Amino acid sequence: MTVTLSGFADEISPDLDEQLATLTAESVAHLELRSAWSVGVADLSDAHVGRIASALGEAGVRVSAIGSPIGKIPVQAPLGPELDRLRRVAEIGGRLGTPIIRVFSFFIPAGEPPGRYREQVIDRMGALATVAEKHGAILAHENEKEIYGDVPQRCADLIESVYSPALRATFDAANFVQCGVRPHSDAYPLLRRHLVYVQIKDALADTGEVVPAGEGDGEVRETLAALRDSGFEGYLSLEPHLAEAGPFGGFSGPAEFRRAAQALQALLAELQIPWR
């Protein structure tokens, strides 16, 4: 088993050159593209994408996934514009060499039971998956707070109900902690067979504060060991959120991003997990 390290490089800096310099200094040869020059990935122009491709080639860095915001809208919002945005980010992913696109399963109205929206969410995610299939893309659904798929049971039910090869799961331990879920004990058994991608961030259960991997209650060490034992060979993507965290992204800065990368690399060394 060998895992591949990546990260949300816009947590380092809005500037792509500084992002790439910090990644390469920490021997991280992939990035998850969420934004560059403070432009969100779904809004990047063809000229932007060309500049990104050139900079990546010069730095020897590749794109592991598109960190899109697709599905981070209210469940009652019109779906058409979201399908158009997905087509655009799938095109960008194709140009940059990755089929993987992070997505979400829609914000549920505050105070309402998520189950009330189950069929609507399944229909919407099925429509996204159909677009992804046509573009040769793989949607990696992230468990995010306050969306339909925020707890493992709904994540698994969603993926199994849509039943498309284009809809898989990404695993975010910190988000599970912030939803009162034990990531390895409760979520991993339900989601392992659906996992195509793993986000690396940890959190404290009592406050929800995000901390480097292994320093919180996210059972990151246990999850990495289980992934090792199962032969997982996918991406581990750093999303540190060590300086700022919000519903549409986070920020760490170069020094804190390096601290997060080194914490993950130390865990991998402890667990004897090869990485590249």
Identify the role of each PLM range.
Residues 1-29, 53, 57-60, 97, ...:
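Histidine-acidic metal/acid-base catalytic patches
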Residues 1-6, 63-73, 105-108:
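N-terminal small/glycine-rich loop or linker at the start of catalytic domains
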Residues 11-13, 35-37, 69-72, 105-109, ...:
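Active-site-proximal loop/turn and secondary-structure-junction residues that shape catalytic pockets
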Residues 14-21, 55-58, 75-169, 178, ...:
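Active-site acidic/histidine proton-transfer and metal-coordination neighborhood
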Residues 3-6, 36-39, 73-76, 112-114, ...:
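A short, structure-level motif marking secondary-structure boundaries and short turns
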Residues 32, 65-67, 102, 140, ...:
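Conserved beta-strand positions in the central sheet of alpha/beta enzyme cores
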Residues 42-46, 75-80, 112-117, 180-183, ...:
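Short, solvent-exposed loop/turn segments at secondary-structure boundaries
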